[in-house]
Amino acid sequence: MTPLTFPEALDYLYSFVDYSLQRSYRYSAEVFDLDRVRDLLARLGNPQDGFASLHVAGTKGKGSVSALMASSLSAAGFKTGLYTSPHLLRFTERILVGMEEIPEEQVARLVAEMQPHVAAVPGLTTFELVTALAFAHFAREAVDVAVVEVGLGGRLDATNVIQPLVSVITSLSYDHMHLLGDTLSQIAAEKAGIIKAGVPVVLAPQQREAELIVLEAASREGAPVIQVGKDWLYAPGAHDLDGQSLYIWSPEEQPLMDAFVESAGEEEWAPPRYEIPLLGYHQVVNAAVAYAALRTADAGGIHVPEASIRAGFRSAVWPGRFQVLSRSPAVVVDSAHNRDSALKLRIALDDYFPGQPVTLIFGASGDKDIPGMMEELLPRVSRLIVTQAVHPRAADPQELSSLAQRHGVRVETLAPVEAALARAIERARPGEVIVSAGSLFVAGEVLAAWPQLQRLVVSETAAAR
């Protein structure tokens, strides 16, 4: 085995086909062949069989749900792995054990060990290799349980070789339509591809069209379905920029909940209350989904006490999702990148910053529903700065500007992302909210630039005084 440095290991991983960098490709079983993933894992000793797992698919919210679950499992004393993608700042964010990133030297070591086995399996992709790397790390670290987030779709995703204790399907909406299908039913069918025979499914609230597809798929596999909003009920509590609370209860407790509400909280019984640092009503739903999945995992021997769920929810970290970086001026980084998440962002802005003018820093991948995102966001925006992330799929800012001008909003074009953020801060007026959205890659570049630009915020605030 030839030793590698961390940069050499990354170069090796990225030397394979990386579909995340391509705008179009064929989404089929011939291109995404799970047999080759199984072949590689078998050569590595099937590391994925060495730990319990929870599998999370969905269009939106799957990362937040995964982070909430992993944080709670860790709080309960389980040695917990967490695999997510893509990363915002560092490759090592994708693979966590005990909420700690995989060390760079471990990446280099495991990739070097994998190389001869990879050479024996033709056609592997970057994501397939990284998935195998994550499983190998989890096995090497002897984790008790891993939370595994699907990369794309579900049916043909490289993660779909695990046999989980619970399959989780979060909110489904329109994204990756050129790959997964033009209808919500087609998208739901791809996501439902993670359902395994007899393995319980936790399903987030869905549009009826998507719900029916998932229920049919689960029925075919003999997989029981736990529906959040039916089998577990939830409601938001208080919220501010520091976080929010929520209540979760069972249908059997509904009469008690009714009495609690009618008495304005004077009843002796009160529904369980949880606190999360993640903002926006959609995160209340995600927390309820995470709770239902953890409760469902009880039957598989993974018991997380209520106190651990509370502690895990309170300490969960999932950056780039309506994350407030500054309050004066207000600077919010979000990763909304389809129409549904753009709508949720607009609702969150109205909820947390009612009536305040918004400057939007917007960049998107060229394969996303850019007109749909603009239709949701631009009515709430007083000034728009279009920009471009350093990514092969990033849309041309001039094209974004042309689309935006049809909405009658003031548009400025400025790249890179760091320059766009600096301009927004320099021109911020009292009470204005600066928001970045449209792409995970834009969110990542905002977060990367923030430590330096934070000084500009301080100086601008001081000058205003």
Regions found by a protein language model. Name each.
Residues 389-391, 455-465:
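Short, flexible loop segments at boundaries between secondary-structure elements
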Residues 83, 200-205, 359-362, 382-390:
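Short internal beta-strands
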Residues 21-34, 38-53, 75-162, 178-181, ...:
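ATP-dependent carboxylate-amine ligase catalytic core
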Residues 207-217, 222, 330-333, 339, ...:
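C-terminal helical cap/extension that packs against the catalytic core
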Residues 1-27:
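Charged, amphipathic alpha-helical linker segments immediately N-terminal to NTP-binding catalytic cores
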Residues 86, 130-179, 212-270:
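Extended acidic/charged loop-beta regions that coordinate divalent cations
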Residues 64-68:
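Hydrophobic positions on the alpha1 helix immediately C-terminal to the Walker A/P-loop
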Residues 145-150, 157-168, 172-174, 186, ...:
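Nucleotide phosphate-binding/pyrophosphate-handling subdomain across enzymes
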